[in-house]
From Swiss-Prot:
Residues 914-1102 form the Rho-GAP domain. This is Rho GTPase-activating protein 39. It comes from the Eukaryota. Residues 7-19 have a biased composition (Basic and acidic residues). The gene is Arhgap39. One of its GO terms (cellular component) is nucleus. PANTHER family: FI04035P (PTHR45876), RHO GTPASE-ACTIVATING PROTEIN 39 (PTHR45876:SF1).
Amino acid sequence: MSQAQDYECRSHHVDEQEPRIPGSSTRLEWVEIIEPRTRERMYANLVTGECVWDPPAGVRIKRTSEDQWWELFDPNTSRFYYYSAASQRTVWHRPQNCDIIPLAKLQTLKQNTESPRASADNSPGRGSRDGSTGSSLEPELEERTQELPVRSGRATTLVTSKEDTSSCSPPGVLLEKDYEVYRDYSADGQLLHYRTSSLRWNSGNKERMLIKVADREPSFLTPQGNGYPADNQPGGHHRRPSGSQHSPNLQTFVPDTDGTVFFPERRPSPFLRRAELSGNCSPLLIQPRKPSSDSQPSSPRYGYEPPLYEEPPVEYQAPIYDEPPMDVQFEANSPYQTGSPQRSPGRKPHPFLQTTKQTPTSPCQQLMRTKQKCPERFLSLEYSPVGKEYVRQLVYVEQAGSSPKLRAGPRHKYAPNPGGGTYSLQPSPCLLRDQRLGVRSGDYSTMEGPESRPSQPPTPLPQAQEDAMSWSSQQDTMSSTGYSPGTRKRKNRKPSLCQVPSTSSTDGAGGLLGEQPLTEERSPCRASLTPVKAEADLVRGTPEPFLAQARLAWEAQQAHFHMKQRGSWDSQQDGSGYESDGAVPLPMPGPVVRAFSEDEALAQQDSKHWKRSTFDKLGFPQILLEKSVSVQTNLASPEPHLHPSQSEDLGACAQFESSRQNRSAMPSSSCVFPTFTLRKPSSETDIENWASKHFNKHTQGLFRRKVSIANMLAWSSESIKKPMIVTSDRHVKKEACEIFKLIQMYMGDRRAKADPLHVALEIATKGWSAQGLRDELYIQLCRQTTENFRLESLARGWELMAICLAFFPPTPKFHSYLEGYIYRHMDPVNDTKVTQHIKELLERNSKKKSKLRKKPKPYVEEPDGVAISTYAKYCYHKLQKAALTGAKKGLKKPNVEEIRHAKNAVFSPSMFGSALQEVMSMQKERYPDRQLPWVQTRLSEEVLALNGDQTEGIFRVPGDIDEVNALKLQVDQWKVPTGLEDPHVPASLLKLWYRELEEPLIPHEFYEQCIAHYESPEAAVAVVHALPRINRMVLCYLIRFLQVFVQPANVAITKMDVSNLAMVMAPNCLRCQSDDPRVIFENTRKEMSFLRVLIQHLDTSFMEGVL
């Protein structure tokens, strides 16, 4: 070696102790290695990391032998393992009486001596990355120019960056983002030296460096000075930031003494063998690197760097994605990104001595890089943060040959959610469109490699199967050389659908692609496979049947997963969720069928079950899950006078409705109980799955046999000894058994001393007071109304469910299941089927008893039928309404009058929450001559009778919630008590009636006109006259009523001028349908202005005396 080279070697190696071959006293820096597949000899320097094809001159070389073992390091288990190139064996324990070649250290050194792609990417004739393809010979001829030897012996320093410089930067451009770049230029403009400051994950004394795992570049491609090491270049100084240390990853590549530059990623091909000596260096290699802010992908013409070890010939599987070491801490504000560089489709990988290089990833593979069951720990897909103690040992080598068939897909970065614990998939500024594949940025497909079974340490894979591995997903950062022994210490997993017939089922490799669950946005990726495969067959010569089989198996796996998890992914794009899209609900196959077991209507929305069943395995970013979970509890919206036990379900249900509206095609109002879309229950999921995870294990009989889930979900005349749902609350455990007895009493299945209304009152009071009992109560009601062959008991069970829903909803966890159960009974056709079937069973039982000569029981007249559909429709409406309002507000517990009213409301609808036309129909018998709703006029008169126009803060100060509830109960019975004293009570109830109208007082189709003409009195009045007659009459009566309060004499006392009245009354007349807070905020001001204009300018004299 030259003196400069020798100085470079000795001043930049990582370890202070130079390596020695075990069993020898002579220091040997060069070793001979025979590549296992091509049987070609290679020579590596264990000190500098230099690799050459030809034997170096003037040095001793350790020849290869049968007893030569290569020492490698597995980062997953932090253990060394040993590979024999002669026998292709891999063992854990260090072999005895043999030569150990510490290639782990060599690999670490090579990782520290590589730099991003230099300006040679600008070579003429190079096809651009935006879709152009060339022949298989073109890249080889171009690379002949690229690998011309550099006789001047120029050295190259490593640039370690946090940003993927090759996948997003144009040729000759170093993307300056998230790191600092230091450059030295010579007088003629050539780049003499550049490097970056070390990046740290943690502050403090313990420095953790970033080893670039996913994108290694040939270090010799970076132009440097003329024959000098980086630190000793004349005319350029090695600049460093103050306080930074020369970290081990800033190493220098030294070419061979004869000037021949070895391409470590090159494999001999039919077109190119070795680089010939040349007296001149290619001008492409010395172009100065120009800073630029533009971002475009780098050239794909360089051959990629192959794995050191791959899977055994018997089988193979997609990689397992491993997380960084357990002791590495990450800062919360660090961006994590995935790169997607490319490589030449015309080059076969060199089979040996590579450092990891980011492989092309299609959109089908972007979301694959998440760690299973560790969403909080899947981080960088491009870098592996490791401490100094790992840098000197770890070997990061790619799992298998990267696919030259798939172009680089769009780049994405996984950014931590400020909420904590979740990660969001965000488009990178470097997003590009792959024109050749026609893949749009944002079209993703999710794939998952199967977990391997325990097996031996890794062994090489033949080239034929390496090509076939190109369809598999690529390995994450912390994966070692192929499949290291640590990656096999995973639990067993079901064999993949796409397992190739030639693979063995005894070892650790899985299918060709492994299990690849897909999201709903997968069609663009699937469509792009055909052209990709055709191109691959053209340039690589991969057998067509093998790729066709792989593609078919992959699509079969997609279809299998889609069918299996169809109900678990609430897709917004293709509508494959459970929205009915106008479909008529399917009738039940019969009442005997366990309806509750089939009623999974919205089971996939249960967040815990959904995450646990599918995407926990994938480690999906939580932000992706949040859109598909309809019931969440992260918002709370308690209201004044709210009972302490009601705040949680209020916010959760409000969030549920908000999420449900986001999925609907026509978003309903956020402050109204809209006409809810009926939904089909999912046939793929079953509540028994949920029950098996949440139910207690019940036993029966002397031998304590376990009760099946199906029997636990069917009607029972026996009592229960423990709650249906697993709970740790002692109060719930005690009350659950008592509630079940009370339910049996109310339904007539158990003798009761108290009146049924008082039994229902006790049940409703317990559920209203203790939120933990609500799910238990509803699951018991569902059980007792399933396979119940007594018509009276069945009717009472549904009646009790309606009573309970009038006071409190279930918790969000059980909301979807109850909704699905109710939905299944909303078809009126089933009422006749249930009644007929029950009568047939009764007749059959009576015949059996007559044959056995048993004394028949006294005949009890059964009702002709049960209107289950009527109960179900009412319960469905109350359930959706409770999702917005939550449980009954106030401090007073339910009373008998409220129970009676809730019982009668099933067949006698309330005036609150109904449409104007329905309210007029209700009062037609009592008040046939009235043109206005009785409730509106009666409450308005009551406000004035109590001197509301002389009461300060009228319509602004709320009335006592308990008194408002009591008055509402009376009004629903067409009564108004005479003992009222506070005008705020009827005023609050009047506002409640306006607010709870099924359709707003000013219909939605007129909303935009109102917002547009909020400043024009003429246009505003014209909008009022265009309303339907009943709406116009009610609105004009309201305006005339409010005009009383804006009189100057009244305003002086009430402190409620026209602006204040418009502010408090506008939300009761106009309802914004947008969910955008900015739109709501802006429209609120316009709504108030519109109502103020009406109060000031609308002529309501024609309403004099109208009732």
